[in-house]
Swiss-Prot record:
UniProt keyword annotation of Magnesium present: yes
Binding-site positions, dimethylallyl diphosphate: R525, K605, T606, Q643, N650, K660, K670
Binding site for Mg(2+) 4: D516, D520
Name this protein carries in UniProt: Colleterpenol synthase
Motif DDXXD 2: positions: 516-520
Biased composition (Polar residues): 391-400
Residues the entry annotates as binding Mg(2+) 3: D516, D520
Species of origin: Colletotrichum gloeosporioides (Anthracnose fungus)
Domains: entry comment: The conserved DDXXD motifs as well as the NSE/DTE motif are important for the catalytic activity, presumably through binding to Mg(2+).
Annotated region described as Terpene cyclase, given as residue ranges: 14-335
Residues annotated for Mg(2+) 2 binding in this entry: D95
């Protein structure tokens, strides 16, 4: 592997007072981090409406401005270093935001981040999206842009970062307060400070592919280095953290190794510092001893990728310390002219504030004036220590680097015709006030009930809505809500209208799922029993039909004339039912349509709901400068891609098989694109048609399904479908770029949704 790391000059190391025994390195092109870091700060503050300063660029004498990632990942691939820098600064700025935000604000940010991190390509995740303003959606676009940048560079390793970040997010945000020793503290702090994420960022940055089993083998050795990073971070961040705590009434106690030692070990602040100095040295020494032992087991040397991984862990320790010495993010006690801190009666305070306190003392002066031997002797003989350094100092590492022209004319005509009668139409509602009250009871509204999911959860257990409530408990990818939010980034629909449109689309989608499962004889939905298997076919048909009544009630809430909304809904629902009729006809008669007819069916069936969504959003849009823009070609391509991808994944995806069963479309007798291509090409067409025509109700025998899939592979139908999907992927991105240009804004959220569905 090429080397990009360069040793930091000896004179710079010497003047820094570095304690680490490892040799610090810096990226040979470390200056490329400066602009990404500054840009991320601006990007974050604009998205979050904050005025935070990351202070991640340290002015190191002899080097100039250096970002922590250039020291912690000195051998990072140059083309990946800017993206790593931006992501690291995002995590750091987010940490600062948590310090000033309310808990409900923090939880919302975390929820948005989790949604951005979820892998939408795997069925089974459960997401919820609430309608929001442009201000609310800006953070989501920022998060999506960061994830997208990493995925574009290396999707596999990027998803490892996202998975680790998602798993540790709650611990990183809300640290526990029941850790009494450093042995308890260190492992938790390692996660809290983002070092597990940093480990995946290292692999991404350097392009290292290390198996989970090899990472597990290396973990004890690497964790020792990570614990040393935590000690370094806690030592240098303590003055800032305790200052913030003491000056912020009601704030949480600092989650810091110094605090653990003072609160639960009975140590003074200087004693806690001395213990942590000794602990850093001990951790580094034990790391080297265990590394030597591991190498001996492996014949004297680890494989190159593993050696690079461990080497980076060492450089991260000393790099973290060198950066901490000079960064403005961590002013020293001397910089702050901060008195010694003590812990008395369950609270921290400055010694100068205590009764009979003497002169202010700066801890850095008192600690550094003691010889190393005195530090070690005092620690080893201290009666306050319940055990060894290991017992007292088990502190987890805290990394400082973690971060339609025709369509519009049509709508305009309708609006003009009904402008004078709009109020009358609304007054002459098709639904009586009594009926509307009944509907409101079945799907309640009110404070806190801002999403379709929350309204369903609050709905009564009435038979007419029970199948819908059941569907809401099943896993969902949430793609439609994300799609609506992403389009709204361009169209700027009022919040109440956006919420209503999401509800309408969700209602119609649920209705179609219930009816589809009945019409397709499906017994499973997302790995669970289909609704009609629980509530009965007749009851589910009634519930699905009742949804249309509720949709009419929701349409009345929109700001555009009711006649416009009803016209749009009627036209697109007609398309949906026409498409479904073709699909059912081909299945019942085992009739193989042409590829063109199949595409038209998808455009009607799948595209109907997408177009309904887009047209309602356009009708409610507050923008007047985009009336001549037409997103329908993009929507058509997206609909085709969604359905054909589903056809393909149903036959080849292990994840789909786990959720739905192997080749479930064949159980239903569905005429999908791979089946059409197979029947057009295979010499065994008569045999396959025979299997399909003589299929009995219920699942197809596994041997028959395996036979048909083998024939698909032999004749190239599956490969042709895959190639078609890959071409569609390129067309979708090209169409997205056109729309971004027309609307005048990038749409990272929409692109991320697309790319996570890609077929490789």
């Amino acid at each position: 592997m090429p080397t990009f790391a360069q040793p930091v000059p000896d004179d710079i190391v010497a003047s820094s007072g570095l304690r680490s025994k490892f040799r610090p390195h810096v990226h040979g092109n470390y200056q490329i981090c400066v602009e990404p870091s500054k840009g991320m700060e601006t990007f974050y503050n604009d998205a979050m409406s904050t005025q935070l300063e990351s202070k991640t660029l340290a002015d190191i004498p002899g080097l100039g401005l250096v970002h922590p990632m250039a020291l912690a990942m000195a051998n990072c691939l140059p083309e990946r270093l800017p993206a790593i820098t931006r992501f690291a600064d995002f995590t750091i700025l987010n940490d600062d935001y948590y310090d000033i935000a309310k808990r409900d604000e923090i939880e919302k940010v975390n929820s948005d981040i989790q949604n951005a991190l979820q892998d939408a390509s795997v069925p089974g995740s459960k997401t919820q999206s609430s309608a929001g303003s442009d201000k609310d959606f800006k953070p989501k676009q920022m998060q999506a842009a960061l994830v997208l940048e990493l995925i574009m560079l290396d999707q596999q390793l990027a998803m490892d970062i996202m998975s680790s970040y998602s798993q540790g997010l709650d611990v990183a945000t809300f640290a526990p307060d029941n850790l009494r020793t450093l042995d308890e503290y260190l492992p938790v702090r390692k996660v809290n400070s983002g070092l597990d994420v940093t480990a995946e960022m290292v692999c991404f940055g350097m392009g290292l592919r290390i198996s989970p089993s090899d990472k597990a083998k290396l973990r004890p050795v690497v964790d020792l280095a990570n614990f040393a990073i935590t000690v370094v971070n806690d030592l240098y961040s303590w003055p800032k953290e305790i200052k913030c705590h003491l000056e912020t009434p009601g704030s949480e106690l600092p989650f810091n190794a110094v605090a653990v030692l003072m609160r639960h070990g009975g140590y003074s602040e200087p004693e806690a510092f001395r213990i942590l100095y000794a602990k850093q040295a001990e951790l580094e020494g034990e790391h080297l001893r265990q590394l030597d032992a591991l190498r001996a087991q492996e014949g004297g040397r680890l494989p190159e990728n593993q050696e690079l991984y461990v080497e980076n862990a060492q450089r991260a320790v000393c790099g973290s310390e060198l950066w901490s010495v000079y960064t403005r993010r961590y002013p020293s006690k001397a910089d702050l002219r901060q008195p010694e801190v003590e812990f008395v009666d369950g609270a921290f305070r400055y010694v100068a504030d205590g009764e009979g306190a003497g002169e202010e003392k700066v801890v850095s002066e008192s600690v550094e004036s003691l010889p190393t031997t005195e530090v070690e002797d005092e620690f080893s003989s201290s009666d306050a220590s319940p055990g060894s350094v290991d017992q007292a100092i088990s502190t987890p590492p805290s990394t400082t680097f973690c971060s339609c022209e025709d369509e519009e004319e049509h709508i305009a005509d309708v609006k003009e015709v009904c402008e004078d009668e709009a109020d009358g139409v609304r007054d002459m509602s098709d639904i009586s006030q009594k009926s509307k009250k009944k509907i409101d009871t079945l799907l309640p509204e009110g404070p806190g009930l801002t999403t379709y999911a929350s309204r369903l959860e609050a709905a009564p257990d009435h038979a007419v809505i029970a199948p819908i409530k059941y569907l809401a408990t099943l896993p969902s990818k949430g793609v439609r809500d994300t799609f609506i939010d992403a389009l709204n980034w361009w169209l700027e629909v009022p919040e109440d209208s956006l919420r209503t449109i999401k509800t309408i689309i969700s209602m119609l989608h649920d209705s179609s799922l219930i009816l589809d499962d009945i019409e397709d004889d499906s017994t499973l939905r997302r790995g669970s029993p289909a609704a009609h298997m629980i509530f009965g076919t007749a009851q589910c048909i009634n519930a699905a039909n009742h949804i249309f009544v509720m949709v009419l009630a929701e349409l009345q809430k929109l700001r555009s004339p009711l006649k416009t909304a009803i016209l749009i809904a009627t036209e697109e629902l007609e398309s949906l039912f026409v498409g479904q009729a073709d699909d059912l006809h081909w299945k019942y008669h085992v009739d193989c349509p042409s590829t063109e007819d199949y595409m038209e069916m998808i455009d009607n069936k799948t595209g109907g709901l997408f177009r309904l969504c887009v047209r309602l959003l356009q009708a409610e849009s507050t923008r007047t400068d985009v009336l001549d823009l037409d997103p329908r070609p993009f929507v058509r391509q997206l609909s085709l891609f969604f359905q054909i991808r589903d056809d393909y994944q149903n036959l080849v995806s292990d994840a789909y098989a786990k959720q739905k069963g192997f080749a479930e479309d064949l159980d239903e007798g569905k005429i999908s694109l791979p089946i059409i291509l197979t029947l057009q090409r295979a010499r065994t067409r008569p045999e396959i048609m025979g299997v399909l025509k003589h299929k009995q109700p219920g699942p197809m025998a596994i041997e028959m399904k395996q036979y048909i899939v083998r024939e698909m592979e032999k004749c190239g139908a599956l490969e042709s479908t895959r190639e078609l999907l890959q071409g569609m992927q390129e067309d979708l991105i090209a169409e997205l770029r056109r729309l971004e240009g027309d609307f005048g804004a990038k749409n990272a959220t929409l692109e991320l949704v697309l790319r996570r569905l890609w077929i490789s």
